[in-house]
Regions:
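Aromatic-lined ligand-binding clefts that engage carbohydrates, nucleic acids, or primary amines
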Residues: 126, 221-250, 255, 288-291
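Carbohydrate-binding surfaces of carbohydrate-active enzymes
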Residues: 22-212, 225, 295-298, 305-308
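Extracellular and analogous surface-interaction loops
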Residues: 103, 114, 127-128, 213-229, ...
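Gram-negative bacterial Sec-dependent N-terminal signal peptides
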Residues: 2-20
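Noncatalytic modules at the cell exterior or secretory-pathway interfaces
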Residues: 267-272, 278-294
């Protein structure tokens, strides 16, 4: 586990959480009507690189963002920046390290980033806060979760954040517990590869750049050796922007690592087992129809799952 002292944060200010984020049940998926900032310059690289550039600008207290509004994925990137800016509006880089931002309802908030875009990690973040209830607010998805683990000692609180490569998070310490769900603790040893039948049309070529090209996977049978709690499609080493539909369900645009989606919500599993003998191979199976719209390059597509 990596230990990070939070060295980047924001000066104290007062701003109503409800004015920025709405009620907790709505997450913070809907910023105020004026929250869509205008892009100030053209895109100069892939979205993941722009995200890191924007993170740096936000931490430095700058308002400019790098994004071409006509570029695929620009809407998601602009929404991401809007969430960041409007949550910490009127703030600037703090003179004192790990100074948080205090809101009118007593919530104290911090902003942190995972420094690498190469691998996921369980990151331990250390904050000068006690007696409050920590939550992890994901600006990329709008989800609000309780950390999988947290502890208090010596006037500080340590929060474990299961961070994806290059991810950012708001760590919010609330005065009262909320209905936020606990973040799942996913171990690499739990994830297993899944064999899927069927073919792509056309067959994608790994590490080849595509512009607005659609690939379809159909007539496949997604079969699992147990009962799935999560099921993923993984685009491997990818760069660019990708839109994915599974069995007609549209998922959030992928524009930064990890280029992986949990598609379990789009799968209607049925029991798969025809024997009552001890040790029989009983699991789940589901039809699988995928539409992948690619603006960029991706690696070998794989399927993974966590099964009970």
């Amino acid at each position: 586990m990596n230990i990070y002292k939070l060295a980047l944060a924001f000066a104290t200010a007062t701003l109503s959480l409800s004015a920025v984020c709405g009620e907790l049940e709505d997450g913070f998926k809907n910023p105020p009507a004026d929250a869509e900032p205008k892009a100030s310059q053209e895109a100069t690289g892939d979205v993941a690189a722009l995200k890191l550039q924007n993170d740096a600008a936000l931490l430095a207290g700058k308002d400019d963002i790098a994004c071409n509004p006509a570029w695929p994925g620009a809407k998601e990137l602009i929404r991401y920046v809007a969430r960041c800016r409007y949550l910490f509006r009127a703030s600037k880089a703090a003179d004192k390290a790990d100074a948080g931002r205090t809101f009118k309802d007593g919530t104290v908030g911090f902003f942190a980033t995972h420094p690498t875009d190469k691998q996921s990690a369980a990151v331990s973040l250390d904050f000068p806060v006690t007696g409050k209830h920590p939550e992890l607010w994901d600006p990329a998805t709008g989800r609000i979760l309780r950390p999988s683990k947290s502890s208090e000692a010596g006037g500080r609180t340590t929060v474990v954040w299961n961070a994806d490569p290059g991810a950012s998070v708001f760590v919010m310490f609330r005065p009262q517990p909320s209905s936020a769900k606990k973040a799942p603790k996913i171990l690499a040893s739990q994830i297993q590869d899944v064999e899927v039948t069927g073919t792509w049309d056309p067959e994608p070529t790994p590490d080849t750049a595509f512009a607005n090209k659609t690939f379809r996977f159909s007539e496949g049978l997604f079969r699992l050796p147990g009962y799935a709690t999560m099921a993923w499609i993984d685009l491997g080493k990818a760069k660019g922007v990708f839109e994915i539909k599974v069995n007609g369900k549209k998922f959030p645009t992928l524009w930064k690592p990890p280029y992986r989606l949990n598609i379990a919500d789009a799968l209607s599993f049925e029991a798969d087992g025809h024997s009552t003998e001890p040790g029989a191979d009983i699991g789940q199976q589901a039809e699988l129809n995928v539409e992948l719209k690619a603006n960029g390059s991706f690696g070998t597509i794989t399927w993974q799952a966590i099964c009970d």
